[in-house]
């Protein structure tokens, strides 16, 4: 038995030695800091050692270590909630309309979170008398986390504690939003769409507090109006054109450029055009003004 363990340890050691040697040969030494590691990942993509999706996921994993829950949470104003005194039918109306599976339950307002309701917990009441339904019978305890919690630690907590949603509070104890495990995973693997996600032509969609998805065909005029910017549309009309002009070439997915303090990352592109970008606005910028 000990011989087997010794053989296994030797094998692992040999593998580690092999990969260290490989890194040394390809990249002239192992990375010493975060910037060198990022450069190594990008070089690996350019050398076709990893594909674009893998590169983006590796970069995403590194990015979450620098972010706080406040950066990715769903803002309080966009939270879809249920009220503690709602009937079964009223709850079902909200669930069907939103197609969500978890809901904060409030009493008076969004600062008074009573717990979390999971849509699946309503199924037994749909087969019996709806009058038997009571929110108290299905209410689950809400997990509360501070805005300042690191995203990587939040993901670890989601996994270890096996829950998918947490209520986010500010330093004064007021509710500022909510965060889900899906929000974090989307930072790593990109937007997760399911059968209930509708394909639409919305130009601007919020991903986190400071990051927005923007269609490349969105006009610069509309972007300026929404984000309070002053990008010129004299030479190009669209955000995709603005980004391509700034790069000076057709950028590949994952390439990033800073334009007047706004960080533009190519989220989708093909061999002919940019399709979608992620825009990170400066921390001190006001939230965009969008038509409801």
Curated annotation (Swiss-Prot):
UniProt key word Repeat: yes
Keyword match Transcription: no
Swiss-Prot/TrEMBL keywords: CBS domain, Cobalt, Magnesium, Repeat, Transport
Superkingdom of this protein's organism: Bacteria
GO MF annotation list: flavin adenine dinucleotide binding
All residue ranges annotated as the CBS domain in the record: 73-133, 135-195
CDD domains the UniProt entry points to: CBS_pair_CorC_HlyC_assoc (cd04590)
InterPro entries: CBS_dom (IPR000644), CBS_dom_sf (IPR046342), CorC_N (IPR054115), FAD-bd_PCMH-like_sf (IPR036318), FAD-bd_PCMH_sub2 (IPR016169), Ion_transp-like_CBS (IPR044751), Transptr-assoc_dom (IPR005170)
UniProt record similarity statement: Belongs to the UPF0053 family.
PANTHER family: HEMOLYSIN-RELATED, MAGNESIUM AND COBALT EFFLUX PROTEIN CORC
Function: Plays a role in the transport of magnesium and cobalt ions.
Name of the protein in question: Magnesium and cobalt efflux protein CorC
Taxonomy of the source species: Bacteria, Pseudomonadati, Pseudomonadota, Gammaproteobacteria, Enterobacterales
Gene name as annotated: corC
């Amino acid at each position: 038995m000990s011989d087997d363990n010794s053989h296994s340890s030797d094998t692992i050691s040999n593998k580690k030695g092999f990969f260290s040697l490989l890194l040394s040969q390809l990249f002239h030494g192992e990375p010493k800091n975060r910037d060198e590691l990022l450069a190594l990942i990008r070089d690996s993509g350019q050398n076709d050692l990893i594909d674009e999706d893998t590169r983006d996921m590796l970069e995403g994993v590194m990015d979450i270590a620098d972010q706080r829950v406040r950066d990715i949470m769903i803002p309080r104003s966009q939270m879809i909630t249920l009220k503690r005194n709602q009937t079964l039918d009223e709850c079902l109306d909200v669930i069907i309309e939103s197609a969500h599976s978890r809901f904060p339950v409030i009493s008076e307002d969004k600062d008074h979170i009573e717990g979390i309701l999971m849509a699946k917990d309503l199924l037994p009441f749909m087969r019996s008398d709806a009058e038997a339904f009571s929110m108290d019978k299905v209410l689950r305890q809400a997990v509360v986390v501070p805005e300042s919690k690191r995203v990587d630690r939040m993901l670890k907590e989601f996994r270890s504690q096996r829950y998918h949603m947490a209520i986010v509070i500010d330093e004064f104890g007021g509710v500022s939003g909510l965060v889900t495990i899906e929000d974090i995973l989307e930072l790593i693997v990109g937007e997760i769409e399911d059968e209930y996600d509708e394909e639409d032509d919305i130009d601007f969609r919020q991903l986190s507090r400071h990051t927005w998805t923007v269609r490349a065909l969105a006009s610069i005029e509309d972007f300026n109006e929404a984000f309070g910017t002053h990008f010129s549309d004299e030479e190009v009309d669209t955000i995709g054109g603005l980004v391509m002009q700034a790069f000076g070439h057709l950028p590949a997915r994952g390439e990033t450029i800073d334009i007047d303090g706004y960080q533009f990352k190519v989220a989708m592109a093909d061999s002919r055009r940019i399709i979608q970008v992620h825009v990170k606005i400066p921390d001190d910028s006001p939230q965009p003004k969008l038509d409801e």
